[in-house]
Amino acid sequence: MSGTLLAFDFGTKSIGVAVGQRITGTARPLPAIKAQDGTPDWNIIERLLKEWQPDEIIVGLPLNMDGTEQPLTARARKFANRIHGRFGVEVKLHDERLSTVEARSGLFEQGGYRALNKGKVDSASAVIILESYFEQGY
C-alpha cells in the first residue's frame, strides 16, 4: 500500500480532484475534470488512477447542513459506485459540508476574485474533503 489517496468533489459541470498522502495527512489540488451533466471523461479518471495508483478514492458526499440528503447526494453516490465498478478500487464517501465555502474563502484570500475560477474552487474543495478525511483518523 502506497498510502496515496485521490479525492473527488463531484459536480454536474466540473469535478474537483486532489491527491494526498496518508503519512503526511496533506493533499494538493490537481486539474478539475469537466463533466457533462455529471458524467466525466472516464479516460481521464483512468489516467489519474494509473498515474497515482491510489489505495482508495474519497468522494465528497454533498449533504444539507442538517445532515439530510439533497438532490446531488444520490448523483455523488452513483459517481462513487461507477468508479468502484469500472476500476475495482476502494471508494469511500465523506461528508463535504462547507468544503466549497472554505475553498472559495481560501482562494479569495490568495488572489481575490480572479482566483475564484470554477475548476480551482472544485479542486480546492477536493483538497479540503481529503484533508478532513485524514483529520478524522482514516
UniProtKB/Swiss-Prot annotation:
Record-level Gene Ontology MF annotations: 3'-5'-DNA exonuclease activity
Location within or outside the cell: Cytoplasm
Presence of the UniProt keyword Electron transport in the record: no
Transmembrane segments: none
UniProt record similarity statement: Belongs to the YqgF nuclease family.
Keyword Cytoplasm: yes
Keywords: Cytoplasm, Hydrolase, Nuclease, Ribosome biogenesis
Assembly: Monomer.
Protein's name in the database: Putative pre-16S rRNA nuclease
Gene Ontology biological process terms, A to Z: DNA damage response; ribosome biogenesis; rRNA 5'-end processing; transcription antitermination
Gene inactivation effect: Essential, it cannot be disrupted.
E.C. number(s) listed in UniProt: 3.1.-.-
One GO CC term on file: cytoplasm
Pfam families per the UniProt record, alphabetical: RuvX
HAMAP family in the record: Nuclease_YqgF (MF_00651)
Annotated effect of mutating residue 125 to A: Allows cell growth, i.e. not toxic
CDD domains, per database record: YqgF
Chief localisation class: cytoplasm
UniProt effect for mutating residue 122 to A: Does not process pre-16S rRNA in 70S ribosomes, binds quite strongly to pre-16S rRNA-containing ribosomes
Role of this protein: Involved in the processing of the 5'-end of pre-16S rRNA during 70S ribosome maturation (processing does not occur on total cellular RNA off the ribosome); may be a nuclease. A temperature-sensitive yqgF mutant no longer grows when Rho or NusA are overproduced, and has reduced transcription of genes encoded downstream of Rho terminators; transcription increases again in the presence of the Rho inhibitor bicylomycin.
